[in-house]
């Protein structure tokens, strides 16, 4: 089944480029940039990838991102991810990048963007993988800081297709960012937002009604609110679900408890994604395979999930 799932044409719609930084590349970039790491070797770092919640993961994620300093670093990061896409027949990807993670430590916005954009362009020309880049605001920072990030991004508006919202969810509702999302839409960008991962269903309502999103990232807690479920089904609002991430961060205790197939069978436009694959133990195919292994996902369900991902693209072919 793994090989069949791997060969299935699919799109990935929920992937943080910084979260695809494999330990081997992290160590190589640290050496290139002469950065001392707190881990003695790759295996020690891998052992640190045990998380009880979203915040524990984010602490390590931001620490790891510190090795990314030059446009070449961001190119190498993105290119390594695109090679994984090629291996797994991901024919289209819409990755996130978090400029604030880098600008807050003194890396110029254009250094980050130039490296990523060059790799995505080469990915289309050399690997045949189409893409649309999403600029994501960090929700644990202020709305004013998000506005400043949008200011920095506007001169490069052609390089990305949408804005998103990620990082620590609890205590940072979508409503906190309503004005910056209004402005981004006015500037011509599409919008997506993480909601209903650790946060309550109310955050999903806010993302839909206040941020006017095209897609919900995660959204697994929608199932707790029947009226919300009906709206998501009626309006066919896609959910970019990340099964391995959800179990690794204890949103579900075990994959056998995951609700993605229940939502699929109810008519929700759910998709399968890897989120931060270097940290969560798998890329898209591994996520599909986990659903087969632990939830008995059938080939028919896998085909529908893959088709949903192609249908839910922001960048249409």
From Swiss-Prot:
<keyword id="KW-0378">Hydrolase</keyword>
<keyword id="KW-0479">Metal-binding</keyword>
<feature type="binding site">
    <location>
        <position position="276"/>
    </location>
    <ligand>
        <name>substrate</name>
    </ligand>
</feature>
<feature type="active site" description="Proton donor">
    <location>
        <position position="197"/>
    </location>
</feature>
<dbReference type="GO" id="GO:0006146">
    <property type="term" value="P:adenine catabolic process"/>
</dbReference>
<dbReference type="GO" id="GO:0008270">
    <property type="term" value="F:zinc ion binding"/>
</dbReference>
<dbReference type="InterPro" id="IPR028892">
    <property type="entry name" value="ADE"/>
</dbReference>
<feature type="binding site">
    <location>
        <position position="16"/>
    </location>
    <ligand>
        <name>Zn(2+)</name>
    </ligand>
</feature>
<dbReference type="GO" id="GO:0005829">
    <property type="term" value="C:cytosol"/>
</dbReference>
<feature type="binding site">
    <location>
        <position position="14"/>
    </location>
    <ligand>
        <name>Zn(2+)</name>
    </ligand>
</feature>
<dbReference type="GO" id="GO:0000034">
    <property type="term" value="F:adenine deaminase activity"/>
</dbReference>
<dbReference type="GO" id="GO:0043103">
    <property type="term" value="P:hypoxanthine salvage"/>
</dbReference>
<comment type="similarity">
    <text>Belongs to the metallo-dependent hydrolases superfamily. Adenosine and AMP deaminases family. Adenine deaminase type 2 subfamily.</text>
</comment>
<feature type="binding site">
    <location>
        <position position="275"/>
    </location>
    <ligand>
        <name>Zn(2+)</name>
    </ligand>
</feature>
<feature type="site" description="Important for catalytic activity">
    <location>
        <position position="218"/>
    </location>
</feature>
<dbReference type="InterPro" id="IPR001365">
    <property type="entry name" value="A_deaminase_dom"/>
</dbReference>
<keyword id="KW-0862">Zinc</keyword>
<feature type="binding site">
    <location>
        <position position="194"/>
    </location>
    <ligand>
        <name>Zn(2+)</name>
    </ligand>
</feature>
<protein>
    <recommendedName>
        <fullName>Adenine deaminase</fullName>
        <ecNumber>3.5.4.2</ecNumber>
    </recommendedName>
</protein>
<dbReference type="InterPro" id="IPR006330">
    <property type="entry name" value="Ado/ade_deaminase"/>
</dbReference>
<dbReference type="InterPro" id="IPR032466">
    <property type="entry name" value="Metal_Hydrolase"/>
</dbReference>
<dbReference type="Pfam" id="PF00962">
    <property type="entry name" value="A_deaminase"/>
</dbReference>
<dbReference type="GO" id="GO:0009117">
    <property type="term" value="P:nucleotide metabolic process"/>
</dbReference>
<comment type="function">
    <text>Catalyzes the hydrolytic deamination of adenine to hypoxanthine. Plays an important role in the purine salvage pathway and in nitrogen catabolism.</text>
</comment>
<keyword id="KW-0546">Nucleotide metabolism</keyword>
């Amino acid at each position: 089944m793994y090989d069949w799932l791997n060969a299935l044409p699919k799109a990935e719609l929920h992937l943080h480029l910084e979260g695809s930084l494999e330990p081997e590349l992290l160590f190589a970039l640290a050496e290139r940039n002469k950065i001392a790491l707190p881990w003695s070797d790759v295996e020690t770092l891998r052992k640190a990838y045990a998380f009880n919640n979203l915040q524990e993961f984010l602490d390590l994620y931001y620490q790891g991102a510190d090795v990314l300093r030059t446009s070449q670093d961001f190119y190498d990061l993105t290119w390594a991810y695109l090679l994984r896409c090629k291996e797994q027949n991901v024919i289209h990807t819409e990755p996130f990048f978090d400029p604030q993670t880098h600008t807050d430590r003194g890396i110029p916005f254009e250094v980050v963007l130039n490296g990523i954009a060059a790799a995505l362009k080469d990915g289309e020309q050399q690997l045949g993988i189409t893409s649309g880049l999403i600029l994501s605001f960090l929700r644990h920072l202020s709305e004013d800081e998000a506005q400043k990030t949008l200011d920095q991004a506007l001169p490069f508006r052609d390089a990305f297709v949408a804005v998103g919202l990620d990082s620590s969810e609890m205590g940072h509702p979508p409503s906190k960012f309503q004005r910056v999302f209004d402005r981004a839409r006015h500037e011509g960008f599409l919008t997506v937002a993480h909601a209903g991962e650790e946060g309550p269903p109310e955050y999903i309502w806010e993302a839909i009604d206040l941020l006017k999103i095209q897609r919900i990232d995660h959204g697994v807690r929608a199932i707790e609110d029947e009226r919300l479920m009906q709206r998501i089904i009626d309006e066919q609002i896609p959910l970019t679900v990340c099964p391995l991430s959800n179990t690794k961060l204890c949103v579900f205790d075990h994959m056998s408890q995951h609700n993605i197939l229940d939502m699929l069978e109810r008519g929700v436009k759910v998709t399968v994604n890897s989120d931060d694959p270097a940290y969560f133990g798998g890329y898209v195919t591994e996520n599909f395979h986990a659903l087969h292994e632990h939830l008995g996902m059938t080939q028919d369900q896998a085909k529908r999930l893959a088709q949903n991902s192609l249908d839910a693209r922001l960048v249409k072919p």
